[in-house]
């Protein structure tokens, strides 16, 4: 298991996960769009969610983000 605090400013990037990730949003707002499946989800301060180990998709950070993350290896 690896955990920590991650901060990022407004912008966009593509993400590809090879392990599960637990996320708790402390600050900010992000629109997450999976590649080739499902619809976008907007997450913001107070939300907690899990990325599956095969997730691939884009992050559109609309407000600066501070999140807690925990990768399950």
Feature-to-residue mapping (PLM):
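Ligand-binding loop in jelly-roll beta-barrel domains
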Residues: 44, 53-73
């Amino acid at each position: 298991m690896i955990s920590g605090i991650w901060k990022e400013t407004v912008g966009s990037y593509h993400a590809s996960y090879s392990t599960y990730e637990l996320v708790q949003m402390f600050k900010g707002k992000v629109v997450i769009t999976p590649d080739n499946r499902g619809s976008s989800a907007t997450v913001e301060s107070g939300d907690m969610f899990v990325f599956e180990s095969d997730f691939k998709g884009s992050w559109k950070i609309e407000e600066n983000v501070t999140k807690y993350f925990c990768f399950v290896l």
